From Swiss-Prot:
Name this protein carries in UniProt: Thiamine-phosphate synthase
Originating species: Dictyoglomus turgidum (strain DSM 6724 / Z-1310)
Recorded name of the encoding gene: thiE
InterPro entries named among the record's database cross-references: Aldolase_TIM (IPR013785), ThiamineP_synth_sf (IPR036206), ThiamineP_synth_TenI (IPR022998), TMP_synthase (IPR034291)
GO molecular function: magnesium ion binding; thiamine-phosphate diphosphorylase activity
Pfam families (alphabetical): TMP-TENI (PF02581)
Length: 223
């Protein structure tokens, strides 16, 4: 896929899954990602905050092989060097990470660059700086980070969906139980962490979420 085709996945009804071994109830990131991909997910973000860099490298190499096998995107959280070394599809950076312009200069134009945003001002700044997509949230309370950001609610998400030209990935506390609230606003690409990785049956849970997304895409649900 070229970059334009990759970005289409972020614009469409897709599940965007993030790794989080800490919440994977004893399962390794590799095994979790394999199940997620087998279930049909096309976007994986490798997010691992606590492991040594060498361990992250060996892990992300294996995940890159898996995503290539399943023709899925691999986005690496934070690490520009890992992104480039393993030839991932892109990087996702936070508000306190490298500036977008630095990431663009280091990686080049063929890599996708996503940015975490929490406010309208940050969203507009992401547009000005040339982000390829934004992650907007946390929509609901989320505790996967050591210092979680307060939930921003659905109002900003509603505004972004109606006013932003680049893909908006909704993230933060999204579950099977509240996903319809997000999709009814017009959101398409939905990020999930613990709802997937903490599920006793990752494959089954992932298929359920994909089925819901396909229902909206095919008009089964009226937004």
């Amino acid at each position: 896929m070229n970059k334009k085709e990759k970005l289409e996945l972020l614009k469409d009804f897709n599940l965007y899954c993030l790794t989080c071994e800490e919440y994977s109830i004893g399962r390794k990131n590799i095994d979790v990602v394999r199940e997620i991909l087998e279930a049909g997910v096309k976007i994986i973000q490798y997010r691992e905050k606590k492991k040594p860099m060498r361990e992250k490298y060996h892990e992300v190499v294996k995940i890159r092989d898996l995503t290539a096998k399943y023709n899925a995107l691999l986005i690496v959280n934070d690490h520009l060097d890992l992104t480039k070394i393993v030839e991932a599809d892109g990087v996702h950076i936070g508000q306190e990470d490298y500036p977008i312009e630095v990431a663009k200069e280091f990686l080049g134009e063929n890599f996708i660059i996503g940015l975490t945003t929490h406010t309208k001002e940050q969203v507009m700044e992401a547009l000005r700086k040339g982000a390829d997509y934004i992650g907007l949230g946390p929509i609901f309370p989320s505790y996967t980070k050591e210092k979680p950001h307060p939930p921003i609610g659905i109002e900003i998400l509603d505004w972004a969906i109606k006013n932003i030209s680049i893909p908006v990935v909704a993230i933060g506390g999204i579950k099977e139980s509240n996903i319809h609230e997000i999709l009814n606003l017009g959101a398409k690409c939905i990020a999930m962490v613990t709802e997937i990785v903490s599920s006793p049956n990752i494959y089954e849970k992932t298929r359920k979420i994909i089925h819901i997304l396909e229902g909206y895409k095919n008009g089964k649900y009226i937004a």
